[in-house]
Amino acid sequence: MKRPVLIGITGGTGSGKSTVAKEIYNKFDEACIAMIEQDSYYKDQSSIPFEERCKKNYDHPDAFDNELLINHLKNLVDLNVIEKPIYDFEAHNRKEETIKVEPRDIIIVEGILVLQDPKVRELLDIKIYVDTDADVRIIRRLLRDINERGRTVDSVINQYLTVVRPMHMQFIEPSKRYADIIIPEGGHNRVAVDMMVANIKHLLQK
């Protein structure tokens, strides 16, 4: 097995980056592709009371255990199996169990700050930024956090105004300049997704 092709997919919250990642994932046989979500690498907070965990800024680079993420990506590149963490968004902490991820020809790394850390960037063969209007992103985040993460409307809006938007402007938006490809309209941009799939297939043939 050759060195895996690592693809980084980033963008603001609700931009459609997960949709783009899934669209690309579904174009390949499951035996040759794996998905690594940056959200899985939020730091372990077992020593912090739940009330304090609820107040943490989860859109800041310091919220992520990038050391572990980088270690796992390097292991996959070296064709080693990893144990990917599982994050519980309602408890704001890692679960005890993990998911075994085996090396594949293609590794997708998806998350809001994938291009922010230079040590992560240097491991990526293709860097994608999914660009979507802010009003669309906040609506998507609102629906997701209420339906999937047990949040209230007020808490989501307050978090967006005080944390999410400032962090987007400070860390996520500036990382756009490191992207090889900028995809507008998220997962609905079929032309861009098809172009990326063709490019990945070309890299695999080298």
Swiss-Prot record:
Instruction: Give the enzyme class.
Output: transferase
Q: Which InterPro entries match?
A: P-loop_NTPase, PRK/URK, Uridine_kinase, Uridine_kinase-like
Which pathway?
A: Pyrimidine metabolism; CTP biosynthesis via salvage pathway; CTP from cytidine: step 1/3; Pyrimidine metabolism; UMP biosynthesis via salvage pathway; UMP from uridine: step 1/1
User: E.C. number, please?
Assistant: 2.7.1.48
List positions binding ATP: G11, G12, T13, G14, S15, G16, K17, S18
Kindly state which reaction or reactions the protein catalyses.
uridine + ATP = UMP + ADP + H(+); cytidine + ATP = CMP + ADP + H(+)
Q: Does the keyword Kinase apply?
A: yes
Kindly give the SUPFAM superfamilies that the UniProt entry links to this protein: P-loop containing nucleoside triphosphate hydrolases
Q: Which domain of life is it from?
A: Bacteria
Q: Does the keyword Acyltransferase apply?
A: no
An individual GO BP term: UMP salvage
Q: Which Gene3D superfamilies match?
A: P-loop containing nucleotide triphosphate hydrolases (3.40.50.300)
Which family does this protein fall into? Answer: Belongs to the uridine kinase family.
This chain belongs to which protein, by name? Uridine kinase
